[in-house]
């Protein structure tokens, strides 16, 4: 018998196939069961999902497209929702294995593509109390967030300029003066 079961089908399909957590737990009570899905818990939980829907819901296209600065949504090529969900699943399973080693108990764990995509834009999320805060925004050309944190086209190619500390700003100013 398996110690861990992981799948990414919709949970109602797992129930129909008899491979849902409750059915398998009846066979192996200490089973670790990881269900990965497209959407967060709630009204969309049972809907099919994919990398791009997760990116849209998390705001990746908005942020990557510099829409706050008048840009347009940008299609995400990273597939971070899919790969990130795999990483989240691996972490959840490792935590469950640790719990099982300490307690002898199996458990149900779950992750979602949209959760992985939220990690991709975690720099723009609100505080836990729901209040907002000033945050860097990608410009509409998707080249940077500020004059000293941007990509510039030069006669020799592209330059990535990142000047993050005040003393380096002063040093750059001295060199350019």
Label every model-predicted segment.
Residues 2:
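An anion/phosphate-binding loop that grips the pyrophosphate of nucleotide cofactors and donors
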Residues 5-63:
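N-terminal Rossmann-like NAD(P) cofactor-binding subdomain of oxidoreductases
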Residues 42, 51-53, 57-177:
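Acidic, glycine-rich segments within the central catalytic cores of soluble metabolic enzymes
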């Amino acid at each position: 018998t398996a110690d861990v079961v992981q799948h990414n089908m919709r949970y109602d399909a797992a129930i129909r196939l008899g491979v849902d957590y409750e059915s398998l737990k009846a066979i192996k009570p200490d089973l670790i069961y990881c269900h990965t899905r497209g959407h967060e818990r709630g009204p969309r939980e049972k809907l099919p999902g994919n990398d791009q829907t997760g990116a849209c819901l998390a705001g990746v296209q908005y942020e990557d497209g510099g829409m706050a600065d008048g840009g347009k949504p940008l299609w995400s090529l990273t597939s971070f929702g899919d790969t990130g969900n795999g990483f989240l699943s691996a972490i959840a399973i490792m935590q469950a294995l640790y719990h099982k080693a300490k307690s002898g108990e199996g458990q149900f764990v779950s992750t979602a593509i949209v959760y992985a995509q939220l990690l991709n834009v975690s720099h723009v999320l609100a505080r836990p109390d729901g209040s907002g805060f000033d945050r860097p925004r990608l410009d509409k050309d998707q080249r940077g967030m500020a004059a000293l944190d941007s990509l510039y086209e030069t006669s020799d190619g592209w330059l990535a300029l990142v000047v993050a500390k005040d003393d380096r700003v002063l040093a750059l100013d001295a060199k350019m003066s």
